[in-house]
């Protein structure tokens, strides 16, 4: 069970008035904030806090879906040889359009460096 606490008395002055989440099942404490000595999100054994007195604070924990960043996929349906030929003979492919970072762009409008980058990223030997 997770219990929120505010330390009201401690031998270590850095712990005074700090806020923690105690996990009684694991015997661990997660620092929410402290004056010093502990960083936010530090997880330590409860015994490391030493002799303390505390008051419980209400913790409202709701299940939450946490998405770190997003996924993005650009699909270009063509062969590597087609892009390599477009680099060598751009006049043969005036309408060749590809997807780059979510945008449609004419392959011939890219710089040579960008064209090489697209070819390298689009076609790989293995994952």
From Swiss-Prot:
Listed GO MF terms: formate C-acetyltransferase activity
UniProt superkingdom: Bacteria
Modification Glycine radical occurs at: 102
Keywords of the record: Organic radical
Pfam families xref list: Gly_radical
Keyword Ubl conjugation in record: no
Known function: Acts as a radical domain for damaged PFL and possibly other radical proteins.
Full protein name: Autonomous glycyl radical cofactor
Origin species: Klebsiella pneumoniae subsp. pneumoniae (strain ATCC 700721 / MGH 78578)
